[in-house]
């Protein structure tokens, strides 16, 4: 079934570190083996190098909300290719796109384009430090903010201790600038501010978590974080790399009616091409060069290909009924998964928000990383492989979301549920 994928992975191991260009693409978290190599994609479907077809819920870890090879986005990319994909000069298209982002996300007074979500987050931290004159940041356990040194930090031994490096090559001195606290735990957040408040430049928040599954903030949590942070003289940064344009046209901040000082964007806003952006209050953003002392630059930043692709993607998402449709399909999928789990005696919890969900193998409602970490990884690994064999492509990690796209249909959801039912039946044997 996967002969060519296995052969390709063996060859890749000779030339590419670990055989993959991002560790999340390996199957290490689901028991190992050769990852399936895809050859083409269209709409909600993948075809691998062996010719097997899959219904895709990976969606490239979130960006492909309109489905693969969407005609409107494809035409935009063709236009860019025909007119030059990289200028190194200003263009009218980047102004158009900046205006679209500002109209969609009201907290953005000014915007700057970069090349990835990692870059966007990294720069918001630099800007916050420049604006406040402070150096420390607070982040929440389990929330992934890219692979820059400052955010590759794990929790220390207590809720208000300094962090420890979460990767080789991250100096302890950098980790000492980060305090990690549990998500949805306002008392731990207060304790961190009581201890370090005068040194905190910013708190970095996923307003809706996407990196240990889909986890919503408890009622009042984000509002209290905003209030306490500002009282301490620090800034609030929202990492909306996953959430922006995922749950509604705009950001999670608009859905939840909370506003940060700075926002990092990525994934969906590129329409499938590499991009990042950050923005926020005018007086804070004017810290950025050439207006201010906080330096940030990029050869590829604002390139016409990514910008035109992003504009086209947002034009599709702005169409009436898009998010209602994603919510309907998400509800159909969630209800079916839960029904089949009950029928076959499989213990799961599903966290869903509109067109994104996570299936946890536990009976506990997941509200923080510690709970997600304690879910049954072996059960998920078995489920993942059974689903793959049945033509359903999921992320190879118990922490990741299933992403529904505008290309998915009721028939796709029903075919997926048939695979779920069969997988659960086999898991009970």
Swiss-Prot record:
MF-aspect GO terms:
glutamate-1-semialdehyde 2,1-aminomutase activity; pyridoxal phosphate binding; transaminase activity
Reactions listed under catalytic activity: (S)-4-amino-5-oxopentanoate = 5-aminolevulinate
- N6-(pyridoxal phosphate)lysine is found on 267
Q: Name one Pfam family in it.
A: Aminotran_3
Enzyme class, broadest EC rank: isomerase
Report the subcellular localization: Cytoplasm
Q: What is its EC number?
A: 5.4.3.8
InterPro entries reported in the protein's UniProt record = 4pyrrol_synth_GluAld_NH2Trfase, Aminotrans_3, Aminotrans_3_PPA_site, PyrdxlP-dep_Trfase, PyrdxlP-dep_Trfase_major, PyrdxlP-dep_Trfase_small
Check the record and name the PROSITE patterns matching this protein.
Answer: AA_TRANSFER_CLASS_3
Q: Which GO terms describe its biological process?
A: protoporphyrinogen IX biosynthetic process
Pathway listed for it? Porphyrin-containing compound metabolism; protoporphyrin-IX biosynthesis; 5-aminolevulinate from L-glutamyl-tRNA(Glu): step 2/2
Q: Does the keyword Isomerase apply?
A: yes
Q: Which CDD domains match?
A: OAT_like
Keywords (alphabetical) are:
Cytoplasm, Isomerase, Porphyrin biosynthesis, Pyridoxal phosphate
Q: Which GO terms describe its cellular component?
A: cytoplasm
The record's SUPFAM superfamilies line, in alphabetical order, gives: PLP-dependent transferases
Names of the cofactor(s): pyridoxal 5'-phosphate
Stated family: Belongs to the class-III pyridoxal-phosphate-dependent aminotransferase family. HemL subfamily.
Subunit structure, briefly?
A: Homodimer.
PANTHER family named among the record's database cross-references: GLUTAMATE-1-SEMIALDEHYDE 2,1-AMINOMUTASE, GLUTAMATE-1-SEMIALDEHYDE 2,1-AMINOMUTASE 2
The protein depicted here goes by the name Glutamate-1-semialdehyde 2,1-aminomutase 1
**Species this protein is from:** Bacillus velezensis (strain DSM 23117 / BGSC 10A6 / LMG 26770 / FZB42) (Bacillus amyloliquefaciens subsp. plantarum)
Give the lineage: Bacteria, Bacillati, Bacillota, Bacilli, Bacillales
């Amino acid at each position: 079934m996967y002969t060519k994928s296995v052969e390709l992975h063996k060859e890749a191991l000779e030339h590419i570190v670990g055989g993959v260009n991002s560790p999340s693409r390996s199957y290490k978290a689901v028991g190992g083996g050769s990852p399936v190599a895809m050859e083409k994609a269209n709409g909600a479907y993948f075809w691998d190098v062996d010719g097997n077809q899959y219904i895709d819920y990976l969606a490239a870890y979130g960006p492909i909300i309109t489905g693969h090879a969407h005609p409107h986005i494809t035409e935009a990319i063709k236009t860019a290719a025909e007119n030059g994909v990289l200028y190194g000069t200003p263009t009218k298209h980047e102004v158009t796109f900046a205006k679209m982002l500002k109209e969609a996300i009201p907290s953005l007074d000014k915007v700057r384009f970069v090349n990835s979500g990692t870059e966007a987050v990294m720069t918001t931290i630099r800007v916050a430090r420049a604006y406040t004159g402070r150096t420390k940041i607070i982040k929440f356990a389990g929330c992934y903010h890219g692979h820059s040194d400052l955010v590759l930090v794990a929790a220390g031994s207590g809720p208000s201790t300094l962090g420890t490096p979460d990767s080789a090559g991250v100096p302890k001195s950098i980790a000492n600038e980060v305090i990690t606290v549990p998500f949805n735990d306002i008392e731990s957040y207060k304790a961190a501010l009581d201890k370090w408040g005068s040194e905190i430049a910013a708190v970095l928040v996923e307003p809706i978590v996407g990196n240990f599954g889909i986890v919503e903030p408890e009622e009042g949590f984000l509002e209290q974080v905003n209030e306490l942070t500002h009282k301490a003289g620090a800034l609030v940064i929202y990492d909306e790399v996953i959430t922006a344009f995922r749950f509604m046209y705009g950001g999670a901040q608009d859905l939840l009616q909370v506003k940060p000082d700075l926002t990092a964007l990525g994934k969906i806003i590129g329409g499938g091409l590499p991009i990042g952006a950050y923005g926020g209050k005018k007086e804070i953003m004017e810290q950025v060069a050439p207006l201010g002392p906080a330096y940030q630059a990029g050869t590829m930043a604002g390139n016409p290909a990514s910008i035109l692709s992003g504009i086209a993607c947002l034009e599709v998402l702005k169409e009436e009924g898009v998010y209602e449709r994603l919510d309907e399909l998400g509800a159909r999928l969630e209800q079916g998964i839960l029904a089949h789990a009950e029928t076959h005696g499989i213990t799961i919890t599903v966290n869903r928000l509109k067109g994104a969900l996570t299936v946890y193998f536990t009976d506990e409602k997941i509200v923080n990383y510690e709970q997600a970490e304690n879910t049954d990884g072996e059960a998920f690994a078995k489920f993942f492989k059974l689903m793959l064999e049945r033509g359903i492509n999921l992320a190879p990690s118990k922490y990741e979301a299933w992403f529904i796209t505008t290309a998915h249909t009721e028939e796709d959801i029903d075919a997926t549920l048939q695979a779920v039912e069969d997988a659960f039946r086999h898991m009970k044997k």
